[in-house]
Each structure stands twice: as structure tokens, then as C-alpha cells.
């Protein structure tokens, strides 16, 4: 994009993009996305750098040591003059509000939260699962909990639940034990547990008590995380936005949304829940324009252009 907010190219590159510690950084994949979007603007990577500022909002940038590590890795490719790295949660927050501060919550495969105060102070969480004290941490957890509930209902350790039937049906087997065995023998990728999250919401909508209990646990962890950030930044008496982004928030479960709203408003009555309806890349682009001190008209133009411009060359 240009500093006046014109979109010069847009690409969705569906490839391996895990920058978590201990993984081989997917720099070639990221470079391919940059090459393709630059080509739309008539720029080749041979004429590096391709931009003045590169704003990278990446999953896996969870700790300060991650920020330093990934920044070094990206700078080593010389794609842009100035590398700015953020966790993807900051893109969610910026895409959902023009205040410049507030709270952003991402709930997809995992759960994370970042908050910015009106004075610029930042609160973020490691979001490393059980390792960092997270409890009901996102859609991956919800899927695993669904399998656990199905197994416990079947063997008598827990209450009966419609998940006993719905979980194995999703994977085209007859018993939840078969799903467990497939995971144990690595015949089934553990990442596929995320596919069960919509099943839990469907079961809860049908009146399944155990599914509703799991959804309530997830909502309560979202509330606890957001409220911790709100208290730490002393936002409890202020008016601000809480932006909710990620696949879990695209469900249509009114009780889930209401529980989150009521739980946060109990601590911060002036908080307004906003479900993100724009792609997170809008937030990354706006953060880039913020860094360039672009005019408000440029930011408004960017929002409008990205809203009407499909992300090209989907893969």
C-alpha cells in the first residue's frame, strides 16, 4: 500500500507459517507471499527493499525473546527498510477500532489477548497453553475437551453427552475410542481436534449440557484474560472497545457472546464488545500507516479499499 492508503496489491498465501520457537522459520513461505503481492504493484524482489516499512503481525511472536528472534530473521531477508513486528493479536485490535487503544482478544485454535492503554502502555500474554497457566485456551482445547467428554460419557467417568456420537461421526468412525486410538498412533493429526469446536457449539445449541459446560469454561477463560488486562491498565472506569477476533467468535451462539459481554462489563461497564468483521490484515496495514504518520483520510481509504478488494491468488 502507499502512504495515502491506496492498496497496491493483496494476497492470501495459505502455507506453513509457524514462527513458534523450535520450528524452522517459514521465511521462504513469507517471502513468496511478499513476492506475489509486490508483483501486483509492479515491484520485484530483485529490487529490494520493496517497501519503506514492513509491519509483520505474526502468530508465534508471543514473548519478547520471540520478538527479537523473529525480527532478526525477517531483517536478514532485506525485504523492507524498517521491520516492525507485532503479535497477530495487535492486528485484531487495530482492525476493530480506530481509538488507537483498547483490548483485543483472539480465539481460534488458541486464545490470546493484548491491550493498549490510552497512555500507550501495553499488556500482553505469553499464550503458551498450560505452560503459561492458560486453562480453556481456544478452539484446540475445546476440541480436545470434546473428545475427553465423549470418552468419559461412554466409559462412565462422566455424564452422558451427545458428543459420544457426534465426535466419532465427524471422523467417520463408530466410537470415540477409535478417535483416541487414531491420535495415539499418529494416524490422525492432533491439529484436527480443532474441527470439533463447531461440533461442540452445535451440540450445545441442541441442549447438550456437557457441551454447554465446555463452552462456558472457554467463555470464562476469555473473561478472565480480558479482565486481567483491563485491570492492569486501569481501564475499569473508561469507555473503550473490546475487539473479538478469530474463528470461535464467528459462531452464532448468543449465550456464549452474552456470557463474555456480561463478565467483562461486570468489571468494566464502559467496555463495548465488537466482533471483528474485517480481515486482520486490515489491522496490520493500519498499524503500518500509523507508523508512517499517515493522515486519517488515508486510513479511511485503506479500510474501504481492503473491504472491497478480495485477497487475490488464494492458495
What are these regions (language model features)?
Residues 29, 57-62:
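Alpha-helical substrate-recognition element adjacent to the catalytic core
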Residues 53-55:
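Conserved helix-loop-beta element of the AMP-binding
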Residues 61-165, 311-315:
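Phosphate-binding/catalytic loop of phosphoryl-transfer enzymes
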Residues 1-45, 49-51, 75-76, 95-101, ...:
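ATP-binding/phosphotransfer module of carbohydrate and carboxylate kinases, centering on a glycine-rich
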Residues 57, 86, 241-245:
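Solvent-exposed beta-strand sheet faces enriched in polar/charged residues
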Amino acid at each position: 500500500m502507499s502512504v495515502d492508503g491506496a492498496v497496491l496489491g493483496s494476497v492470501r498465501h495459505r502455507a506453513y507459517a509457524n514462527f513458534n520457537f523450535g520450528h524452522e522459520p517459514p521465511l521462504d513461505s513469507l517471502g513468496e507471499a511478499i513476492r506475489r503481492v509486490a508483483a501486483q504493484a509492479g515491484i520485484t524482489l530483485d529490487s529490494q527493499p520493496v517497501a519503506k516499512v514492513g509491519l509483520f503481525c505474526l502468530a508465534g511472536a508471543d514473548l519478547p525473546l520471540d520478538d527479537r528472534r523473529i525480527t532478526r530473521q525477517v531483517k536478514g531477508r532485506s525485504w523492507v527498510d524498517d521491520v516492525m513486528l507485532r503479535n497477530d493479536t495487535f492486528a485484531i485490535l487495530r482492525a476493530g477500532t480506530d481509538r488507537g487503544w483498547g483490548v483485543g482478544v483472539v480465539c481460534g485454535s488458541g486464545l490470546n489477548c493484548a491491550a493498549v492503554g490510552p497512555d500507550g502502555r501495553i499488556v500482553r500474554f505469553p499464550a503458551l497453553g498450560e505452560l503459561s497457566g492458560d486453562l480453556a485456551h481456544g478452539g484446540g482445547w475445546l476440541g480436545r475437551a470434546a473428545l475427553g467428554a465423549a470418552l468419559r460419557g461412554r466409559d462412565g467417568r462422566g455424564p452422558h453427552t451427545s458428543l459420544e456420537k457426534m465426535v466419532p461421526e465427524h471422523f467417520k468412525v463408530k466410537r470415540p475410542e477409535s478417535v483416541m486410538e487414531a491420535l495415539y498412533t499418529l494416524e490422525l493429526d492432533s491439529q484436527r481436534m480443532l474441527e470439533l469446536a463447531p461440533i461442540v457449539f452445535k451440540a450445545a445449541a441442541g441442549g447438550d449440557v456437557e457441551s454447554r459446560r465446555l463452552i462456558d469454561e472457554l467463555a470464562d477463560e476469555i473473561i478472565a484474560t480480558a479482565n486481567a488486562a483491563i485491570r492492569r491498565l486501569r481501564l475499569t472506569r473508561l469507555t473503550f472497545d473490546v475487539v473479538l477476533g478469530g474463528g470461535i467468535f464467528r459462531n452464532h451462539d448468543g449465550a456464549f457472546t452474552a456470557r463474555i459481554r456480561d463478565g467483562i462489563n461486570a468489571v468494566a461497564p464502559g467496555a463495548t464488545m465488537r466482533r471483528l468483521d474485517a480481515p486482520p490484515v486490515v489491522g496490520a496495514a493500519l498499524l503500518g500507516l500509523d507508523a508512517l504518520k499517515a493522515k486519517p483520510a488515508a486510513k479511511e481509504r485503506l479500510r474501504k479499499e481492503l473491504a472491497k478488494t478480495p485477497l487475490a491468488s488464494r492458495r
